[in-house]
Regions:
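N-terminal strand-loop-strand
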Residues: 1-22, 49, 71
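Active-site-adjacent beta-strand/loop module that shapes the phosphate/pyrophosphate-binding cleft
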Residues: 59-97, 109, 131
Length: 146
């Protein structure tokens, strides 16, 4: 699973629950969810998303009410390198009046699903569970016939 470590001073030095699926906001009336997901991938990581047939893993609602639609694609041919991370501006230190730019994410890497679980933001773990269920249903187990 390709996950990205969130950038900025708050996330610096944190690992557990500090990684995220590349994602972002969109207007559902003017942009289909998959187009938005591909655009956000490009904006956050600075590279084109992998080519292939995308699967809609589901739409998940965070405790904040934010809705995230997650897609998966076979990315085995996708190299997790050459990223140019998007940036955001933040007053830092707080109440200092100084604005600084920070990367939206500071690194991205492939992780086995079990290693990704504790590192993913808690609100995104249901998406990981859905991905695991999808993979289990779509990949025949060795030695079994039907």
């Amino acid at each position: 699973m390709l996950v990205a470590h969130m950038g900025g001073p708050y996330w610096s030095g944190k690992d557990d629950a500090a990684w995220s699926i590349p994602k972002g906001e969109y207007d559902a009336e003017s942009e289909p969810p998959l187009d938005a997901a591909r655009r956000e991938f490009r904006e956050e990581l600075g590279v084109a998303p992998p080519d292939g047939e995308y699967t809609d893993v589901g739409t998940f609602v965070y405790s904040s009410g934010k809705r995230v639609t997650v897609f998966a694609v076979d990315g085995r041919a996708f190299a997790a390198s050459g990223f140019t991370f998007g940036e955001f501006e933040l007053e830092w230190p707080p109440r200092s009046g100084r604005r600084q730019s920070f990367p939206e994410v500071d690194r991205a890497e492939w992780m086995p699903l079990d290693a990704a679980r504790p590192r993913l933001m808690k609100g995104q773990r249901p998406a990981l569970d859905a991905l695991v269920a999808h993979l289990a249903a779509s990949v025949p187990l060795a030695g079994l016939s039907g």
